[in-house]
Amino acid sequence: MKKKHKRLLITSGIFCFLSCAVFFILTTLKENISFFYTVSEAIVLPNGQKLIRVGGMVVENSVIRNESEVIFQMTDFNKSVMVKYQGILPPMFSEKSGVVVQGKMFDNSTFLADTVFAKHDENYMPKVLK
């Protein structure tokens, strides 16, 4: 086999291997990626299709806590959605602050959250370190 053909064969083999590796990585990531939508974008998505993340602000005086769940309104200052969450809220969760919720849309006005993330700015310092 000539040197030129051998080099072409090795290059083709490396290209095929890298193509397969990229394909498998992207396929795996597709199943695990959870996109970040605004409230307005999330409302128009098909209900309950997949796990999504929605970001916005907690509406003032909208937080209702009872024994089994927390209910609050979240807005992007364009539209709002009611969020239902069962679990412990993060310590930085408060009204009029940023929040990202992960879960599924139940209907166009209710979001069932599995996880709640409180957003903060780059100057955040935990109380322990202050």
Swiss-Prot record:
Membrane-spanning ranges: 8-28
One of the Pfam families matching this protein, by short name: CcmE
Subcellular location: Cell membrane
Chief location: membrane
InterPro entries per the UniProt record, alphabetical: CcmE, CcmE-like_sf, NA-bd_OB-fold
GO terms for MF: heme binding; metal ion binding
Keyword Cell cycle in record: no
Keyword check for Transmembrane helix: yes
Topology Cytoplasmic: residue spans: 1-7
Annotated heme binding sites: 120, 124
Topology relative to the membrane: Single-pass type II membrane protein
SUPFAM superfamilies in UniProt: Heme chaperone CcmE
Family recorded in the similarity comment: Belongs to the CcmE/CycJ family.
Function: Heme chaperone required for the biogenesis of c-type cytochromes. Transiently binds heme delivered by CcmC and transfers the heme to apo-cytochromes in a process facilitated by CcmF and CcmH.
Protein name: Cytochrome c-type biogenesis protein CcmE
Organism (species): Wolbachia pipientis wMel
Source species taxonomy: Bacteria, Pseudomonadati, Pseudomonadota, Alphaproteobacteria, Rickettsiales
